[in-house]
Structure formats: structure tokens, C-alpha cells
């Protein structure tokens, strides 16, 4: 902090001399200005504050929103309207027990943490209220105190309002519980409002439970948790030294939205006793939406209870293009293995890469790779879902009341051992023949047993690229064309009767038409066929994804009159032909 004398010299633009030499007298105008400034400071008149650095070793720091900056109080001295509040340690290798409290009220407060190292004796290392932004520089450590008379460990950061974190690195760690009635503190705990992480490195560790109490969560928010960038590692605390305690959650929130960055969320391990279980990697009481970034969520293990889930949502789970998600259920020894992804709502995957694995169990059931009490819909991306192994029964690769597979997905579902199912819909293995017509070219769905042996598979080939145009002595040049309008009188419609594009190739007296659909119909009038025959075409082939038909133009012409229409319809692997409305 600057002294009044130093501040006066800085404002007057005059160097401060600290030696014993004799200075030349200042002009009378400067002497008068100095007297006025000093008098103003001594009588408490307002004066613009300079950006300053505050050392946490010097005492607790309280920051609130001022009129044009932050009001910062330390050791009963308040600096008004600080425009760039920086908190740091004089010795970063030694933690201070002093704490930071930020109260934005109805305004906003921004604070920079520059290599701060705090370990509270009790309670939280940093408390924020209202709309607060923490900008990180260097490597910061915020550790809550171990449980005292309350038995609950303190939080690394406690927030009531909107908390935004960006830049640098922070490790926020909850304190440990001290008895069976408390729990470990959270690395970051939001009583209300959202936690937003837009960059930097955030390590959030829940404290451990003791004598059967539960571990704390890495990040615990009563609002939402949003990650758009940076690297986030959230670890739930373990439950130790007693019966019935459960591991903390990696991330626990009302809603989780991840659009970028790298997120790793690990549930803590459960203690002993039938009431214990491993913590969930990611838990949401609403929904989980992952639209980008790389996400790894691991459920914690448990000795006597069940393993935690990789991702658990009371609402729905949506995963879309640009994201990579790995979700692993924790292992149970006496209890069941945890699930990779589980939701009371739907699970929807439209793109990206997903690996979901159920946990294993030594004496109970293996966990499911993906489980939904509503529906599972996969329409794109690459998905691998494996049931865990168990003693009583294996987990399912995917289990739901409804499994909707469509589009250009690539899915491999593996049953757990023993007796698990790869794709369990209402307790029965899904028949892949029922989904073929909903798959696009390039799609592939594989169901395997616990040993990886394929029990069902459907693969939709991509359309063969047409050859380069070449000249032909018969039937014209071999020139591919796509839109139907390029061949007047020949149209192709989809299963709903809507006109669609197709690929055509002429060569060697053959006209070949192809379309990347399971169901499609070729329409041609006999007058059009006569024109094609006059141009040297004597054979027409029609190719859909799983069916191919060859027609003789001469035979078709012999079947009807001038205005009759020929309709050739393909449906999956079967075909029907009508001429003039009559089946042939």
C-alpha cells in the first residue's frame, strides 16, 4: 500500500527522495498543491485509488462492489474503488490461514488471484456472493479447513450467486470430515447460481469422509455447471474408516452443459457396509448436454455397496457432434457394478464418439453400458457400449424400453457375462432386421456376446462412386447424372412418394440407375422406354441399398400400350413390378 506522502509525490509528478541530500526548493504552486492534497487525504476526502496488490499473509481480505471499482478491506483499512484488485502471497510455497470474502451485492466484482495459497483453519478458503469473476494467474491453491465442531469439512470455494472462473490454474480442495455425522467439503460449492468455467485449469477435489460419513463433491452446484473451455478435473472424496459412507460426486449439479475443453469427473470410493456406494462421475438432477470437448466420467468403486455411475441424469442426456465422451461405471465387490450412462429420461446421441462401459461385480450383477427408463436414440456418431461382468448376471450393452437406431451411426453393443444382452428392449434382444430401413448408407450396427462374438450385424454399404465418363459405341457415352430431370420420363420416388435424386450411368446398351435408399420406386412410361430403345438401350438395372433388379426393355414394351406406366418398387430386399397398374 502507498503512504500518503508517496501518493502525493506520484500525483505531483515529482521523484521521491529518501536520502539525506538537500533538494532545491519547489515552486510555490507545487508546494500549495501538495498541502491541499495532503489535507484532503487526512480529512477523508474521496480520491481515485490506484490498482493495488494485496498480500493474503497480512490478514483476511473482504471485497465488495464500490461506486467505480472494488472496495477492499484488510486489517480494518479500506481502499475505495480499486480498479484492478490482485490478491497474492508473499511466499507461495507456504499456505496462509487467512481467507477471502467477496460480496458483489447487486453489482459485479472481478478479482485476480495471482499464485494465492490459502488453507483455512476452518470453513471455506474463499467465499463469493453475487456475480463474481475470478481471473487466475499462475498456480493458485484454495483449501477448506477440516471439520471442527460441525464435523463438516470446509469448501475450497463457496459461492452464492454466479461464479465465473477463467485463465491460469486453481486447485480448490474441500476439507475432510471429522466424524460420522458430517461429510467432506466440496472443492467448489455453489449454494445458488451457476458455476461457469471458460478457460484455464481447474482442479476441484472433494474432502474425504470419516467414520462412515460421505466424501465431498469436486464441484457441487445447486444451479448449473457450464464448461466451454479449459481443463477441468473434478474428484469426489472417498468415504473412509466406517460403515455406510458413500463416495462424493465428481460433478453434482442441477444441470451440466459442456461445449468445449477437457473435463474429467471421478466419483469417490464408497466405504464399507451395505449402505455405501461409489460416487457418480457426473450427476445432474435435471439434464446433461455435451456438444463439444472431451469428457471422461468415472464412477467410484465400492466394497460392500454398488459402484457409482459414470454419468447419471434424472432428466435426459444428449451428446452431439464434436464431442468425445467416455463414461465408466465403478466396480462393486458385494454390490452391483455401476452404469456407464444412466438416465431417468432419454439418452440421445446424434454425433461424436461415445464409449460407455458398465462396472464389474465380484458377487452381484454387472452394470449396463447405457441405461434409460425412457428411450435411447442414436442417429449418428460412433458408439461403443459394453455391459460389465458379474457373478449373478452380466450387464447389458444398452437397455431401455425403446431403442431407436437410425441415420449414419456406427454402433457396437456388447453383452456382459453371464446372461447379459447386447441390445435389450423390454427384456428381449433387439432384432436388427427391424431397423434396416431407418439406416443410411455407411451405417453399421453390431451386437456381440460377452466374448466379442458377433450375434447380429447390419451394415449398409455406401453407394459406389460412378466411373469417369467414357465413350461407347453402343447406347451412348457412359456419363453419370444425378437429378431425375436429366432423364426425362424416368423418375424415382421414396417410400412417401416424394421425388428424389438418383445416379444414372449409360454404357454397353445398359442404363443403370441407383439410389441410396432401402425403399424406392422407379417410374417410366412405355413411350419413354421406346425412346430409350431407339437410342440403343436394351437393358435397365435399378439398384437400391439391399436390392438390385434387371429389366429387359423389349419385354416391358410387349406388356402394355402407348400410355402405360411401368413402376418397379424395392423394399429392403424384395421387389415388385407393375405395368399399367397390373402386377407382373
Model-identified regions with their sequence ranges:
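Histidine (H) residue identity feature
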Residues: 17, 141, 277, 375, ...
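A composition-driven surface/loop motif
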Residues: 2-11, 31-42, 46-470, 474-476
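Long, contiguous ectodomains of secretory-pathway proteins
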Residues: 86, 94, 108-114, 119-121, ...
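Short, flexible helical or helix-coil boundary motifs
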Residues: 11-19, 439, 520, 536, ...
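N-terminal secretory signal peptides that target proteins for export/translocation
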Residues: 1-26
